[in-house]
């Protein structure tokens, strides 16, 4: 979570019930949120995080299985949001990745998401408001699904 601590005023880690033990694996200051209905899909985890965040100018939604994102990428997303972007997402060579930032104007729609597609549909709905932030960071595409992915 150090990746986000440098840039974000608050870092919230959303877990499903029973996964609180991951707290032992995370260093640094963060707030823990349990998404009671996480089994419904990632949309419920996003909603739980937004609810817990409360009042903030923006949120950057990062995925725990993407530890190779560069801190510079997170900084660029935050600066783009500070500049007034509604949605800011990293892009490299025409491909978009994660994490994605959202202006507080979209907190309501983020809490209304359904299923396990994350915010993809919301991004599509607001495509004219999306700022693609060009980065040189392949970590925006690299996720960890198995222990061997860490090498």
Predicted regions span which residues?
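A general structural signal for well-ordered alpha-helical segments in protein cores
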Residues: 43-46, 74, 107, 116-120, ...
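Nucleotide and nucleotide-moiety/phosphate-recognizing core
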Residues: 1-96, 128-135
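Phosphate- and divalent-cation-binding pockets in alpha/beta enzyme and binding domains
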Residues: 21-22, 109, 143
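Conserved beta-strand segments that form the floor/walls of ligand-binding pockets within enzyme
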Residues: 65, 101, 143
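Conserved alpha/beta core of the MobA/IspD/sugar-nucleotide pyrophosphorylase nucleotidyltransferase superfamily
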Residues: 112-151
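Pocket-edge positions in alpha/beta enzyme catalytic cores
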Residues: 34-37, 99, 111, 142
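Short, glycine-/small-residue-rich phosphate/pyrophosphate-handling segment
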Residues: 2, 95-126
């Amino acid at each position: 979570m150090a990746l986000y601590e440098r840039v974000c005023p608050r870092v919230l880690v959303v877990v499903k019930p029973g996964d609180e033990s991951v707290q032992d694996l995370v260093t640094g200051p963060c707030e823990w949120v349990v998404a009671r209905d996480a089994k419904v899909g990632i949309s419920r985890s996003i909603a739980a995080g937004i609810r817990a965040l409360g009042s903030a100018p923006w949120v950057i939604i990062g995925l725990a299985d993407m530890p190779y994102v560069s801190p510079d990428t997170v900084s660029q997303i935050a600066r783009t949001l500070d500049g007034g972007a509604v949605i800011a997402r990293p892009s490299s060579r025409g491909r978009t990745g994660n994490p994605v930032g959202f202006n507080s104007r979209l907190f309501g729609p983020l809490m209304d998401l359904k299923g396990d597609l994350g915010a993809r549909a919301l991004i599509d709905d607001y495509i004219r408001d999306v700022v693609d932030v060009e980065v040189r960071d392949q970590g925006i595409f690299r996720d960890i699904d198995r222990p061997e992915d860490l090498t």
